[in-house]
Amino acid sequence: MPIAEEEKLLPLTQRWPRTSKFLLSGCAATVAELATFPLDLTKTRLQMQGEAALARLGDGAVDSAPYRGMVRTALGIVQEEGFLKLWQGVTPAIYRHVVYSGGRMVTYEHLREVVFGKSEDKHYPLWKSVIGGMMAGVIGQFLANPTDLVKVQMQMEGKRRLEGKPLRFRGVHHAFAKILAEGGIRGLWAGWIPNIQRAALVNMGDLTTYDTVKHYLVLNTPLEDNISTHGLSSLCSGLVASILGTPADVIKSRIMNQPRDKQGRGLLYKSSADCLIQAVQGEGFLSLYKGFLPSWLRMTPWSMVFWLTYEKIREMSGVSPF
């Protein structure tokens, strides 16, 4: 039988392995995003509270709005905007994760298996995993930056309505069109530097921790490559990712949500370093960990849902475990 005919008989996952892994990771990320999105919205709202730069710009809403913790912020969204508003911005979030998670997972596995040449005995040095995780995060997030920008801005629309401000967007596609019209292609990548910085740290925590812990447990304990091992590994990865990623997440959210001039330049911050300095000087060091609790509470279940779903659908699709 000709080689071309033999290839046609192979399962799709073997004929197009990278495409299959991209789609499977996108599906797993969609499930995780839908399950935990209200915590992401709460986190974003918390990160915008008491923004010192807005006060200097003359936004009176900053002075009048009382500070709320995580629970009161979430309850406030339900009471003042409606229960379904907890999922405001979920559509661009799903768009983002299809691109972001697909890109980062395919990149990490390619680096691990092809570039760094994971050895046959499954030993994989931590430093290689760290580099692979950071590079995967950078590539995945750069590709997904436009969808992340729209997600962050749409998450703040409900708050703008309560403050009596005009809404900026009618929907996801209008948001893309408006940002593109006002800032051009460059406008869709606003905040990309702090975004990829955060993604590098988060994926160093998530991918590196999960991969390292999982294979350590499989090789050095009685645990097998099953749901228990996946669950323990994902718990660890969610915690480490939250600790490493929250400060960069605060900076990223503020830069992406700031008002801009006609050239697409931010009116509050010149750069991510400027945003960092203003936050620490105006609000204190702990302002960098605003939203840490909902971030951790979201990252941990998100990580669990994602990894358990991803490992399971890989198994069901005939793809080898991660």
From Swiss-Prot:
Solcar repeats lie at residues 20-114, 124-216, 225-316. Pfam families: Mito_carr. InterPro entries: Mito_Metabolite_Transporter, Mitochondrial_sb/sol_carrier, Mt_carrier_dom_sf. PROSITE patterns: SOLCAR. It comes from the Eukaryota. GO terms for biological process: inner ear development; intracellular triglyceride homeostasis; negative regulation of mitochondrial calcium ion concentration; negative regulation of mitochondrial membrane potential; negative regulation of neuron apoptotic process; positive regulation of cell population proliferation; regulation of D-glucose import. One of its GO terms (cellular component) is neuronal cell body. The chain crosses the membrane at residues 22-39, 87-108, 126-143, 194-211, 228-247, 287-310. It catalyses: H(+)(in) = H(+)(out); chloride(in) = chloride(out). It is a multi-pass membrane protein. One of its GO terms (molecular function) is protein homodimerization activity. It is found in: Mitochondrion inner membrane; Cell projection, Neuron projection. Keywords: Cell projection, Membrane, Mitochondrion, Mitochondrion inner membrane, Repeat, Transmembrane, Transmembrane helix, Transport. Homotetramer. Facilitates proton transport across the inner mitochondrial membrane and may dissipate excessive proton gradient associated with oxidative and metabolic stress at neuronal synapses. Regulates glutamate-induced proton conductance in astrocytes, shifting the energy metabolism toward aerobic glycolysis and lactate transfer to neurons for ATP synthesis. Can transport chloride ions with lower efficiency. The transport mechanism remains to be elucidated. Belongs to the mitochondrial carrier (TC 2.A.29) family. This is Mitochondrial uncoupling protein 4. It comes from Mus musculus (Mouse).
